[in-house]
From Swiss-Prot:
Designated name of the protein: Gigasin-1
Annotated source species: Magallana gigas
Region described as Disordered: spans on this chain: 1-33, 80-159
Summary of the tissues where the protein is detected: Component of the organic matrix of calcified shell layers.
Length: 159
């Protein structure tokens, strides 16, 4: 079947500074990458010897724990649009055989820090006993959005 693309409207103010361009380009090359995120939520490594208590007062049996938690929801949309000579694009720009590659992803970041205190032999939520335990936890839920565009414009069009 024929490939279809969904037009994505991007406000002009988000693309150019204060009407700097106003739809007129002089052989304009534009490479844009918005948002480069690499986020690690929580990483911990705990080593326990046989029947020795860990830093939380828990008893383990030769336990090796490496934990990396990242909760990422990623939405990626790629579209490729070709414009023929003298055909205006969605922004009203005229292109000469224009190739447009767009990758969009949106980012919302929620960070929660919680501190938990445990008294001696008062089991925590995992059923572990702690001796005045202080726990700092940072959880990040990320929706990642990245936009990449490359645009070539001829210099003949003025608005």
């Amino acid at each position: 079947g024929k490939a279809t693309t969904k037009k994505v409207e991007i406000p002009e103010r988000d693309r150019y500074d204060n009407g700097y361009d106003n739809h007129g380009h002089d052989d304009f090359e534009h490479d844009q990458t918005e948002v480069d995120i690499q986020e690690v939520v929580r990483k911990e490594k705990e080593s326990y010897d046989h029947n020795e208590r860990d830093i939380y007062g828990n008893a383990r049996n030769d336990f090796e724990h490496v934990q990396t938690e990242v909760d990422i929801q990623e939405v990626v949309r790629k579209e490729k649009e070709s414009y023929d000579h003298n055909i205006g694009d969605r922004y009203g720009n005229i292109h000469d055989d224009f190739e447009h590659d767009q990758t969009e992803v949106d980012i919302q970041e929620v960070v929660r820090k919680e501190e938990e205190s445990y008294d001696r032999n008062e089991g925590d939520r995992y059923g572990n006993g702690h001796d005045d335990f202080e726990h700092d936890q940072t959880e990040v839920d990320i929706q990642e959005v990245v936009r990449k565009e490359k645009e070539s414009y001829a210099h003949k069009y003025r608005r």
